[in-house]
Amino acid sequence: MTTQQPVAVLGGGSFGTAIANLLAENGHQVRQWMRDPEQAEAIRVNRENPRYLKGIKVRPEVEPVTDLTAALEVSELIFVALPSSALRSVLSPHIERLSGKMLVSLTKGIEAQSFKLMSQILEEIVPQARIGVLSGPNLAREIAEHALTATVVASEDEDLCQQVQAALHGRTFRVYASNDRFGVELGGALKNVYAIIAGMAVALDMGENTKSMLITRALAEMTRFAVSQGANPMTFLGLAGVGDLIVTCSSPKSRNYQVGFALGQGLSLEEAVTRLGEVAEGVNTLKVLKVKAQEVQVYMPLVAGLHAILFEGRTLSQVIEALMRAEPKTDVDFISITGFN
């Protein structure tokens, strides 16, 4: 891949647009595909994505397109920023065009029916593609505004990682590499659940000690579950684990945090989602994660507690009381306590 060869970004949302701008700043011609012709025309004419990144200028090297076939045919590196629900329907008709190309997922989610992550779905759709994921503490608007940011590209394909680093790395955006694709991607999906809990804690003015406890125990739960599924626990000490968890659990810009904050103010889940205007990923992830944790017998008390509040009619005070009465475990799962006297 050279800077003369176009790069494709699939999806017209905030993160896809932020990544498209970064690529353009680094000298790439970018084909940003979106379904909506009106959105594409608005970006083409006004150089702005008013629906998702209002006030951010889209660079002239970014060409918004609605012809997916044309965008895929000219690109070897393709960033996939599609909603999880649209992944199969959009890409399945283009298997031959995608074969052998580099597909990098930007979407943080879990498919409910299969408990598959987005890169696993890409692998299923296009077995001959080269697959990677990009994840980390990456709020789209801050990237677009050139706040200093770091991310992780993860793949078993070292050359893919190097090409993504070369394409995106810039003066305000640093790209690290990992070979733990599953762990990096799982961290990005799981942290959305805990952002809901964090938002509730802030709305209820629970204090800094409480927020710190919640984030730390959330990291323990995420890591415990991920290891049960084959991920490397060390991944969760990096940007895609604790880094993403901190920004999502502490930023009012996070949709999942906003839902939790509304719940903490006394709104129902339906009212909270209505206020947000869209479903927060953490709500759907919570449902499938609760079932999966029970299935594989992984201890996840925060997940169970939030599920009880949102879907089982329990109150927050009841759940907190149960959590605080539970038998204390060891602080860090992966440190032996056999040396205790």
UniProtKB/Swiss-Prot annotation:
The lineage of its organism: Bacteria, Pseudomonadati, Pseudomonadota, Gammaproteobacteria, Pseudomonadales. PROSITE patterns: NAD_G3PDH. GO terms for cellular component: cytosol. The keyword NADP applies. It is an enzyme of class 1 (oxidoreductase). HAMAP family: NAD_Glyc3P_dehydrog. It holds the Pfam family NAD_Gly3P_dh_N. It catalyses: sn-glycerol 3-phosphate + NAD(+) = dihydroxyacetone phosphate + NADH + H(+); sn-glycerol 3-phosphate + NADP(+) = dihydroxyacetone phosphate + NADPH + H(+). Belongs to the NAD-dependent glycerol-3-phosphate dehydrogenase family. Its EC number is 1.1.1.94. NCBIfam families: PRK00094.1-2, PRK00094.1-4, PRK00094.2-4. Sn-glycerol 3-phosphate binds at K108, G136, K191, D244, S254, R255, N256. InterPro entries: 6-PGluconate_DH-like_C_sf, 6PGD_dom2, G3P_DH_NAD-dep, G3P_DH_NAD-dep_C, G3P_DH_NAD-dep_N, NAD(P)-bd_dom_sf. This is Glycerol-3-phosphate dehydrogenase [NAD(P)+]. Keywords: Cytoplasm, Lipid biosynthesis, Lipid metabolism, NAD, NADP, Nucleotide-binding, Oxidoreductase, Phospholipid biosynthesis, Phospholipid metabolism. Its main location: cytoplasm.
